[in-house]
């Protein structure tokens, strides 16, 4: 956000517990539509939540991406539904390798300071049909 010159507004972040994942996203979408406080886009913490958000928006008579953009995260099979959800793919195989390397270091008594395991991953933006460019 900062790099794009967009100020962070904590009031625009919807927090919920995992056990609320079936009801809270839909409830919040309906509340935003009802109050007219719909943003240009909604960023979801995974693709499954993005599907729920899109379905809730469609239930409210809105079209994605014509009326609002939605993104997910994790490039799961959910992201490939319909016209597809724009998402962030993370290198799952590399994450597994890193986890194994960290476990081996722990077993061998390597301290956190002496660790040679890189902890930075390169995500990939996959643009699909759930987002549009703002004019």
Show the residue positions of the predicted features.
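Bacterial carbohydrate/catabolite-sensing allosteric modules
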Residues: 1-135
């Amino acid at each position: 956000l900062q790099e794009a010159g967009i100020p962070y507004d904590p009031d625009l972040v919807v927090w919920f517990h995992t056990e609320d994942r079936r009801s809270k996203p839909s409830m919040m979408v309906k509340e935003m539509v009802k109050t007219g406080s719909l943003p240009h886009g909604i960023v979801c913490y995974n693709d499954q939540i993005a599907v729920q958000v899109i379905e809730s928006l469609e239930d409210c008579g809105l079209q994605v991406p014509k009326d609002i953009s939605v993104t997910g995260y994790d490039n799961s099979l959910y992201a490939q539904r319909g016209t597809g959800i724009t998402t962030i793919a993370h290198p799952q195989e590399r994450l597994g390798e890193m986890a194994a390397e960290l476990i081996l270091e722990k077993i061998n008594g390597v301290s956190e300071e002496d660790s040679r395991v890189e902890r930075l991953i390169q995500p990939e933006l996959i643009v699909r049909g759930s987002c549009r460019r703002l004019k």
